[in-house]
């Protein structure tokens, strides 16, 4: 599904990592390139980062997600809204463009970007030729940003930065 619980594992509905490695090997024999569908906009509420953020008020993952700031007048016209979850510190409001079970990641956070680079490196080193990124235009959604923020510029800059990082790992990446 699109509510990611582990970026570095094969969804059991599709098989095992051994199955994936065999797919890559068999495709390579036939000169077939494999691209992976990645979701960098959000995770599942069952993802370890989100669970740790709820359980631990000082979690390093707290700023991996977008939290509501009542002093901000958020934009409109995009997708999603803020949702509530309850953790050790009480009520936490986080943004989810698609569902309350899919909290959006804070893609402006350099630590989140470093995680994305690690994820791409993991799959590229396993033989993947490139990626298709789901929900690419929602990385910075109007509804999660202060009113008037140029979200399309933020989106473009984010993807240029990630593409440059992928090229450093694998120069001929798709």
Predicted segments, located by residue:
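Active-site and adjacent substrate-binding regions of carbohydrate-active enzymes
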Residues: 1-174
């Amino acid at each position: 599904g699109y509510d990611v619980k582990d970026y570095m594992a094969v969804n059991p509905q599709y098989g095992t990592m051994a199955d994936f490695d065999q797919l890559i090997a068999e495709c390579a024999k036939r000169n077939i390139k494999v691209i992976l569908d990645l979701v960098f906009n959000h995770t599942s509420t069952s993802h370890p980062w989100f669970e740790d953020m709820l359980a631990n008020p000082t979690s390093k993952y707290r700023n991996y997600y977008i939290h509501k700031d009542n002093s901000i007048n958020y934009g409109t016209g995009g997708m999603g809204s803020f949702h509530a979850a309850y953790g050790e510190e009480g009520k936490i409001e986080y943004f989810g463009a698609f569902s309350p079970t899919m909290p959006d990641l804070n893609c402006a956070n350099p630590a989140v970007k470093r995680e994305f680079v690690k994820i791409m490196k993991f799959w590229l080193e396993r033989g993947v030729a490139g990626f298709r990124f789901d929900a690419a235009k929602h990385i910075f959604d109007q509804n999660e940003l202060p009113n008037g923020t140029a979200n399309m510029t933020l989106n473009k800059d984010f993807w240029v930065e990630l593409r440059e990082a992928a090229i450093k790992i694998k120069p001929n990446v798709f």
